[in-house]
Regions:
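Helix-loop boundary and gating motifs at the non-cytosolic
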Residues: 1-42, 221, 225, 233-243, ...
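Core transmembrane helices of Major Facilitator Superfamily
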Residues: 13, 95-106, 318-330
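Helix-to-loop junctions at the C-terminal end of transmembrane segments
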Residues: 48-60, 268-281
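Helix-breaking motifs and short loop linkers at transmembrane-helix boundaries and internal kinks
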Residues: 60, 81-83, 280, 302-306
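Structural signature of the two symmetry-related core transmembrane helices
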Residues: 63-77, 283-298
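Cytoplasmic helix-loop-helix junction between adjacent transmembrane helices
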Residues: 93-130
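Symmetry-related core transmembrane helices of the 12-TM Major Facilitator Superfamily/SLC fold
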Residues: 154-170, 378-394
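Juxtamembrane intracellular "pre-TM" segments in multi-pass secondary transporters
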Residues: 176-222
């Protein structure tokens, strides 16, 4: 009941996300406007993380998932039936906010309930469930397009998955209740009949913004390093296709290279968790950042080389390895440094930082490429990767001490 809802949501999201600009353009948007409408999903995720932290702390993970699923359902149906581009944009924004709440609910549950000895493997598997959906979703969308000849088919497919998800969460086994019952059983002690003296401690509910302020040190240091990882990951999705176009490859060749890179990435998601649980978080984060940072730096030097196509393929594979090695690291680090009594508010801030890094990087790369060149833009992404590696090297030992690791 932890991974299946994530897979269902990500399958639907993966089927719809590539088609958002296409649907917008088919309804009269210009190419520039279609890009802005597609960005409403990321903006919704950024805006949704902090409110989601508040919601999880008030109603719990299970009901947050139900609320997020219901809001997504409303958003997707509104998108399918939208009479105007404004309504469609709002619908995309709502789906983004709901995705943030859904993801944070699972993250918070795993943070409090999964033993630290195999936390990284569990969270890497959670991240792998999301990656599986985002990887398979576009292929399902292509099949639906071929079958029904309309982009709305992917939206209605998402609706079906959301209905199944809501029913599963409402009526399936509740891992939250099961874990709480296990905790009560483990905590049972013999009643000696003696009076209890002294005060009984209670958990203070700090609130979202007070939690952010109390944890400003870790958020401003390790959180920014994590945001740089998210930035480099996101840049990969933009740099590789544009680089392929700039060196003269056709669309099918670019798709093949990017697809192979994605397959390598997906194949390594569980290995990342094994490395983190056995050797420590730094042994996954540092190689991943060094590989991706160095990969972008090397790529920036190969644009005009006679073997640029070969270099493009090799660097795409290296970036896939780096991204795969980092699978689950942001979830795991967030869980490691979150207050264990009430992590949701902190995780909302943590995920806002990492999502912001992922949102800013493509804009930064595009801006640098527009005023200079793709090579300089790629080099800038490589520099962010190396700086992030230094940040992890400095701050993971400081904020994730060895006592939290096996």
């Amino acid at each position: 009941m932890v991974y299946l809802p994530t897979l269902l949501f990500s399958l639907g999201e993966g089927a719809v996300v590539p088609l958002i600009p296409v649907i917008a353009a088919s309804r009269g948007a210009t190419l520039a406007s279609a890009g802005l409408i597609a960005s409403a999903l990321v903006v919704g995720q950024l805006c949704g993380n902090i409110p989601a932290g508040w919601l999880v702390s008030r109603v719990g993970e299970r009901y947050t998932m139900v609320i997020a699923g219901a809001l997504s359902l409303i958003g997707v149906v509104a998108g399918a039936l939208a009479p105007s581009l404004v309504v469609f944009t709002v619908a995309v924004f709502v789906v983004g906010m709901s995705a943030a709440a859904f993801g944070l609910a699972r993250h918070a549950f795993m943070t409090t309930r999964v033993p630290v000895e195999f936390r990284a493997r569990a969270l890497s598997l959670l991240g792998g469930s999301f990656r599986a959906g985002m990887f398979v979703g576009p292929f399902l969308a292509a099949a639906l397009l071929a079958l029904f000849h309309t982009e709305n088919a992917a939206l209605w497919f998402f609706v079906v998955l959301l209905v199944a998800l809501i029913l599963l969460v409402l009526f399936g086994p509740d891992p939250e209740a099961q874990a709480a019952a296990a905790d009560r059983d483990a905590g049972d002690v013999e009643d000696t009949g003696e009076a209890v003296s002294g005060s009984i401690p209670t958990i203070e509910r700090a609130g979202v913004f007070r939690t952010m302020w109390r944890n400003r040190g870790v958020l401003g240091r390790l959180g920014l390093a994590a945001a740089s990882l998210s930035a480099v990951r996101s840049a990969r999705q933009v740099v590789l296709p544009l680089w392929g176009v700039s060196i003269g490859l056709d669309a099918s060749s670019i798709a093949l290279v990017v697809g192979v890179s994605g397959a390598i990435d997906f194949a390594l998601f569980y290995a990342s968790g094994q490395v983190m649980d056995r050797f420590g978080r730094l042994w996954a984060a540092l190689p991943a950042m060094v590989l991706m940072g160095a990969g972008f730096l090397v790529l920036s030097l190969t644009h005009d080389a006679s073997t640029n196509v070969l270099w493009f393929g090799m660097i795409a594979a290296v970036l896939g390895v780096g991204n795969g090695l980092s699978s689950g690291i942001l979830l795991t680090l967030g869980a490691d440094v979150a207050p264990q009594s009430e992590p949701a508010a902190f995780l909302g801030s943590w995920r806002t930082l990492t999502d912001a890094g992922g949102a800013i990087a493509p804009l930064l790369f595009s801006g640098i490429a527009a005023i200079s060149s793709l090579a300089i833009g790629a080099a800038a992404m490589g520099a962010i990767g190396i700086i992030g590696a230094v940040g992890f090297l400095r701050f993971i030992p400081r904020f994730v001490p060895r006592r939290t690791l096996p």
